[in-house]
Design a protein with these regions (language model features):
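Glycine- and other small-residue-rich loops at beta-strand/loop junctions that grip anionic moieties
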Residues: 2, 24-27, 82-86, 107-111, ...
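Catalytic cores of alpha/beta
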Residues: 30-44, 97-101, 112-129
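Glycine/Thr-rich beta-alpha phosphate-binding loop at enzyme active sites
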Residues: 1-2, 43-103
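Active-site-adjacent beta->alpha loops and helix N-cap segments on the catalytic face
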Residues: 1-19, 29-36, 59-65, 85-95, ...
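Short beta-strand/loop segments at the ligand-binding rim of alpha/beta enzyme cores
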Residues: 16-28, 96-108
């Protein structure tokens, strides 16, 4: 996650005889200053895009809910945090990156467990989404549910191409 180390790594990768498309995956724990530096680096090195965000170690700003299975508060749990608790933080980071470079391919991940969460990520600026934890808890039905939900929103807003929704800030309508 260190922009200086990342620059050195990318120089080595770019020197390979064949370089596949590259996406940099960032953590939600980065400061906006570090994110800005990484965005500049991505433009300088012609990287294909960013995957935002993955597992977090930080518990600040998260809902401090009781976890039934362990009996502890979310803020007291150890290890990497993923899924729904990252949703708002991930949306904020996606919006920040999208405002820096509206042409950068952003893959949104972290807390996408419903059609509404997917729509929020897209309207925050993600042009693609990934699901992990949501898939584990909701199963394979999550994907068609997300697709149907997005289609309903596009119809509601009379949008013919999902690209028009990317970064639009449009809210979820029931």
């Amino acid at each position: 996650q260190d922009p200086i180390l990342l620059r050195e790594l990318l120089k080595e990768i770019k020197n390979l005889p064949e370089c596949p498309p590259l996406f940099i995956k960032i953590a939600p724990d980065l400061s906006f200053k570090d994110i800005d530096e990484i965005c500049q680096l991505i433009n300088d090195e012609e990287i294909n895009g960013i995957i935002a965000t993955n597992t977090s170690l930080d518990r600040l700003g998260l809902e401090n809910t009781l976890i039934e299975k362990t009996g502890t508060l979310l803020s007291e749990e150890s290890g990497g945090l993923s899924g729904k608790p990252l949703r708002n933080k991930a949306n904020k980071i996606i919006r920040h990156i999208h405002n820096i470079d509206k042409n950068l391919t952003l893959i949104g991940v972290g807390g996408i467990d419903s059609p509404e969460a997917a729509w929020e990520r897209i309207t925050s600026g993600a042009s693609l989404i990934q699901v992990y934890t949501g898939w584990i808890y909701k199963g394979p039905r999550l994907v068609p549910d997300i697709l149907q939900g997005i289609l309903k929103q596009l119809n509601y807003y009379q949008i013919s191409n999902i690209k028009e929704a990317v970064g639009s800030g449009l809210s979820w309508k029931n």
